[in-house]
């Protein structure tokens, strides 16, 4: 076996193990020792391929976001936000470890993350905003409402939702429960943005 191929297989094994541990216990709860002991990987092998725990975590987050974007790009999102939310939820159900990695930065304070993680988070946010704007472009907006207004409103409500749920992240609620709350709330927010909350008079 070529050395380069062996190295790639080794890194993939380490990443798979790290995704499981970070995806289960979070950055703070997971340790390199856990990864080594549970998955029968030597610590020397990990530090030969990754500088430290931070770099390993960044690679896991990058993989989670890359896989999410790749999955979502298989579908065409037009004016149906429910279809978009269905596919988001489907991905998170299929890949619970990726789900936890992604939501660990959605529902946490940006200040705790390295610049590299912030860049990955921004890539995730930009991708989702682009889908939102693609849907908006196929709708007839109310008079006086611009694309920029729609985007600003969406961003504001999204940030408020994340801030609100990040407080629950510090409570005794399970992380899976928080993810479920986030996705259900986001679906409602998108519905409110598009169709409002008041029934028009006949």
Question: What are the language-model segments listed below?
Answer:
Residues 9, 13, 17, 21-55, ...:
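Helix-turn-helix
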Residues 93-115, 163-171:
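Amphipathic alpha-helical segments used for helix-helix packing
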